[in-house]
């Protein structure tokens, strides 16, 4: 924890049903308990405008390019209104999903889409990438069982196991592509507390 300084941007990534939101909240509560200035946010969403865009994105069947541009527009609003001001004020920002989710969920649907996602992001906000990203690595079969046990669902929750495998493989490839930023936490057989303790060791 002594390496963690003010104004850092931390993101959590992975397929649905792996405990990202739980881990984001646990880290947020831990940092608060240490009197460290911190905010917790999410994507797609995080601002009033971006949350409205989220409703369309997760519930409507959009054309692949439309879906990507919707996600990027929501992110721009989120970054400009919330993330960047908080970082400038010295807060640690924890975000449940960010650019890597867009690469895997929207980028995979387009030819050369993953590279396009990072190119668009660099154009919109050239100086803003996460300082550290935690990829919560849970096997797709386990993740989809957890999702099916939830009462709420959206269009991403009800996809097939093949879809989950494709997204999982994408996150694995991104962790190899950006090894300095993305830290893989193998969590299939760990309790939430054990995962949280591993995350702390990387800070």
From Swiss-Prot:
It comes from Rickettsia prowazekii (strain Madrid E). Its EC number is 2.7.4.9. InterPro entries: P-loop_NTPase, Thymidylate_kin-like_dom, Thymidylate_kin_CS, Thymidylate_kinase. This is Thymidylate kinase. GO terms for molecular function: ATP binding; dTMP kinase activity. GO terms for cellular component: cytosol. Coiled coil: none annotated. It catalyses: dTMP + ATP = dTDP + ADP. It is an enzyme of class 2 (transferase). Keywords: ATP-binding, Kinase, Nucleotide biosynthesis, Nucleotide-binding, Transferase.
């Amino acid at each position: 924890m002594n390496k963690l300084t003010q104004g850092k941007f931390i993101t959590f990534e992975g397929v649905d049903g792996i405990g990202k939101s739980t881990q984001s909240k646990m880290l947020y509560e831990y940092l608060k308990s240490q009197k460290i200035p911190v905010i917790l946010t999410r994507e797609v969403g995080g601002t009033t405008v971006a949350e409205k865009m989220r409703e369309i994105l997760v519930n409507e069947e959009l054309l692949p390019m439309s879906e990507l541009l919707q996600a990027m527009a929501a992110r721009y609003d989120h970054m400009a209104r919330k993330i960047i001001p908080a970082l400038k004020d010295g807060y640690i920002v924890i975000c449940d999903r960010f650019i890597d989710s867009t690469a895997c969920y929207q980028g995979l649907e387009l030819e050369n889409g993953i590279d396009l996602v990072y190119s668009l992001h660099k154009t919109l906000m050239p100086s803003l990438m996460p300082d550290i990203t935690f990829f919560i690595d849970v096997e797709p079969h386990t993740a989809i069982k957890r999702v099916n046990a939830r009462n709420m669902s959206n269009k991403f929750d009800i996809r097939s196991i093949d879809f989950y495998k494709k997204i999982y493989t994408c996150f694995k490839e991104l962790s190899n592509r950006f090894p300095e930023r993305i830290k893989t936490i193998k969590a299939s057989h760990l309790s939430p507390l054990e995962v949280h303790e591993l995350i702390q060791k990387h800070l």
